[in-house]
């Protein structure tokens, strides 16, 4: 509902099946509200942000559905301290193809084992994306992470 989107302060691009290219309406929403509202992307929503920022989303060699992995904050982040390591819940078969270069999107977190990007930020436009699921019981301090994301 367009009226609800216009009235909200935050837009969450949610997890789901498939690939970002399967959801052209989500791309339109992202492009319309980027820089005007806080946008948070989780899993498919994270991939949707990258897809719209000229990232290539590809099939992973290994599928992670219901896996817990350690992630490391690798760059300065508005949300997390650099070098912090914690466990997160993963449910995905797609990933960002690298190398990826962007003037406005910064990779802030990576899988500690595989080095796959796990979080992005665009502080200038108030955009945050997470390949992992902060709402999952597999994510350490998930409720705290969600509160931090929403209050940033």
Protein language model regions, located:
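Phosphate-binding/catalytic loops
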Residues: 85, 130-140
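Cysteine-nucleophile active-site neighborhood
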Residues: 8-79, 87
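Catalytic beta-strand/loop cores that center a nucleophilic Ser/Cys/Thr
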Residues: 77-125
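Acyltransferase
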Residues: 137-152
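Conserved hydrophobic/aromatic beta-strand scaffold that supports enzyme active sites
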Residues: 68-70, 117-119, 129
